[in-house]
Structure formats: C-alpha cells, structure tokens
C-alpha cells in the first residue's frame, strides 16, 4: 500500500520535472521558447544563389552580365573608340583637358 502512495505522488512529480527540465515532449517537439530558439539557431543558413547575390540595375537586369557583354563587345580596349572620342571632345569643351598630353 505504501508503494502505491509513493508512486502516486512520485510519477506526476517526475513527469512534470522531465517536461519542464528538458523542454521537449516524447517526439522532440519544443515546449518552451528558449528551447525552440536554440533549435532554430542550430539550423544551417540557406546558401545564396549566384543570381540572388548579384546587384541589379533599375530595370532589374544583372549588372555583372551587362558589364561582361559591354567588355566583350569593346574587345581589348578599355573604352570603345566612339566613347573615347566623345570623352576627349567633352573634356576639351569644358576646358579641363591639357592638349599637350593628348593627340
């Protein structure tokens, strides 16, 4: 009879202690916020795809791809011949160009 009395008092106490102490149920479901945030912190972060990591311009186009196309079109020149002559002309008109340094 005494054994049943102790078990009657001990079983709810042990169950209550296990639930609050571990913070989980039988299947690993989180009961407390503290345990759920710890579990979230252990999850790996998603890896960014290349397209998500690249910046885009106002039209939503990929800047890196656009720059590659422009450079491929220009060839080995830093600027195309037309761009270079327009740049020289603008600088001459603005008076910021020293004519002795450029042809």
Swiss-Prot record:
Domain of life: Eukaryota
Cofactor(s) for this UniProt protein: Ca(2+); Mg(2+)
GO molecular function, one term: toxin activity
Maturation propeptide residues: 22-79
Region (Disordered): 34-64
Pfam families in UniProt: Toxin_36
Keyword Calcium: yes
Biased composition (Basic and acidic residues): 55-64
Cited InterPro entries: Conantokin_CS
One cellular component (GO) term of this entry: extracellular region
Site (Significant for the subtype selectivity between NR2B/GRIN2B and NR2D/GRIN2D (similar potency for both of them)) residue list: 84
Subcellular location: Secreted
Cofactor: how bound: Divalent cations stabilize the toxin the in alpha-helix conformation.
Protein name, UniProt field: Conantokin-Br
Species: Conus sulcatus (Sulcate cone)
